[in-house]
Amino acid sequence: MHAVVLVGGFGTRLRPLTYAIPKPLLPVAHVPMIRRLVNRLAEGGVTDVVLALGFKPEPFFAEFPNNMCGDVRMTYAVESTPLDTAGAIGFAARAAGITGTFIVANGDVMTDLNVADLVAFHRRSGARATISLTPVDDPSQFGIVETDADGRVLRFVEKPQPGETESRFASAGTYVMEESTLALMPGTEKLSIERVTFPQLVAEGGLFAMATNDYWIDAGRPDTYVQANRDIATQLRDPADAAVHVDAVVASSAVVRDAVVSAQVSIGENAQVSNSVLLNGAFIGNGAVVEQSIVMGSVGSDARIVDCIVGPTGIVQPGHVSTGGRFPEGEIS
């Protein structure tokens, strides 16, 4: 079975990290997001993946130099201009020569969804397309999906106000689609699957949804990226995948709590790191405090950062204090 994986976004919420590294290639517990996603798809029966690319395609080619991810064959569809979700799906599916039933997945979603179960539900229902749903605590922050007892989608409610809907289920970013849906997604112009294609399918009664309680997180924001790293690191059993990588250099007097630390990281004496992700290249000076942050650059001695992102060329000067800062501030040329 084929899958289209949407990875063409700019990753604006994770800048300045994503000026250098496309968001789906950022590691989650030491493994690039895209590899974790493709491995999950493979467990559900996917044999071929086409990446719908736009921004910075070259790093993806480098990540898969033999065009394989495990046993999954990788191909690429590079947009010359952004096509939005449905446009990208139509373009990539045609580029890969997809026929029959196929999967669509968002490249920045981490989930334990059993894709084979979603496909089985899709086939039982006779749907043209099926979307996975996940329960959310605050429906006002999501596009909420209402279904009937059989799972047929009745309507979408975008960021509902209190009392506007009883549903608490949001689209989880994984879809099963029939080849016939490509007629609604020509792939030649910008087109939104959420605002155009799905409503068309709802109108004809051909869109279904399956809700699960599987682990799910959109790792595309700073807070959720940190949370995804922590969540997945705690699920792993291999010492090489421990939250603090065995090859990281951590001073004996440093304190590291609820953080994920990559291999090529140095943490100095009396430094404190909590609720953060330190990526390859990060340097934390003596006495520095790092909280709720993502660091790939340098944090000087006795500096204190909270809710910050330090890119690969970012430098937090010794003694500097920052909340919500981005280092460097401007675009990296």
Please annotate each region the language model reported.
Residues 102-103, 110, 116-123, 136-139, ...:
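Catalytic-core segments of class I nucleotidyltransferases/pyrophosphorylases
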Residues 60-149:
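Conserved beta-loop-beta/alpha segment of the NTase-like Rossmann-fold superfamily
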Residues 242-333:
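Structural signal for interior beta-strand "rungs" in well-ordered beta-sheet cores
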Residues 50-54, 132-133, 294:
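Short internal beta-strands
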Residues 8, 54, 107, 134-135, ...:
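Histidine-centered beta-alpha loop that forms part of the nucleotide-sugar donor binding/catalytic region
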Residues 25, 145-147, 198, 209:
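A structural signal for short hydrophobic beta-strand segments in well-ordered beta-sheet cores
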